[in-house]
Amino acid sequence: LGKSRRDAALDIAGTEGARPVAVRSAAVIAMLLLAGCAPLFVMPSLQSGPFLLLNLAYLGLAIFAGALVLGAQRLACITGRADGPDESQRRWLIGAIIATAVTLSHFQVFKQLVLPGRGFPLDALIADLEHRLLFGYDAWEVTHMLFGALLPTLILDTAYAVWLPIMFLFPAAVVIAIRDQNVRGRLVGTWVVSWILIGSLGAWGLASAGPCYFNELIGPHAGYVRMHEALMVLDQHAAIYGLNVQALHFQEMLRQSQGGPLVFASGISAMPSMHVAMATLFVIGAFQHSRKIGWYFFGYGMLIWIASIHLGWHYASDGLLGAAMMIGLWAISGPTSRLIYSGLRAKGLAKTRPSV
């Protein structure tokens, strides 16, 4: 009888403990959804129709990314290579999906509708400094001397394009692959904050267009004319095999949409490089899961940096600064996470302490 009473008491305590968790999870999700509508209130010129469609598009992609990750996890469970997600991971996954959609839609609003008002005041300075530091060469000339043939260029171009789906999958993949809630929270939190501090505020403070847009948006630059011509020649060679240099077509698409209405993906910004910054976070996250996978992603991160220069998207310093900023955010996330968890733990202990 004593045991049954004790078991019943534990069941009641577990149920009561689960309720606050469910309430907190629902509150976080509700706040994320409300944050998704915030631009409509602070930007009167923002049309609600295109903005809501943008949010729905990103939400759909985020849900698809979550489904892919769950499918991969399910396959790993069937083959005995991994365990299924626990209840905590399922809750985190819902939050990660909504955070992905809200963060990226907000970033697109900023990049397309706010950032163009800043202009591109730093390109000439960055280009001149790099030219001097590289003893009279532009960074793209160095990469083309080393990897200027068609095959290396296509490999770099493909690696750069693959970054987009990896970026989308990252928050959901982290939630499922990382069991440690502290590390999981740091990775997802750093992913979200990086779009604000690096991709938005950093891009505003260091506003630049990049080498591929220099002659169109900044002024004449003979070196970047040669770069574009070299890439065009490679694109023509690739066409013989039914291929192309994808970067050239994406660059033209972004140029045509610059200053236009809100669309799914647009906006021009070079420094700091979010491609390299995010690839750095991929490396950090991969090392948290496996040293072997971490080194694979380190190699991929190096490819992204080289490709960003080789294809004309970025100056060399864009990627170096982006990587440094991401490493800084990750370092800061450690004490921040400990502070948050210690506060939550203290609050939980206070609630469970018996009253006198």
What are these regions (language model features)?
Residues 13-31:
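N-terminal membrane topogenic signal
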Residues 33-41, 103-105, 195-201, 301-310:
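Aromatic-anchored segments of alpha-helical transmembrane domains
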Residues 38-49, 75-79:
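Juxtamembrane "helix-exit" motif on the non-cytosolic side of transmembrane helices
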Residues 48-66:
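Loop-to-helix transition at the N-terminal end of transmembrane alpha-helices
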Residues 90-161:
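Intramembrane catalytic core of multi-pass membrane enzymes that act on lipidic substrates
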Residues 92-97, 172-207, 212-226:
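Interfacial segments of alpha-helical transmembrane regions
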Residues 205-288:
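Membrane-interfacial catalytic/cofactor-binding modules of polytopic membrane enzymes
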Residues 250-352, 356:
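Membrane-embedded catalytic cores of phosphoryl/pyrophosphoryl-handling enzymes
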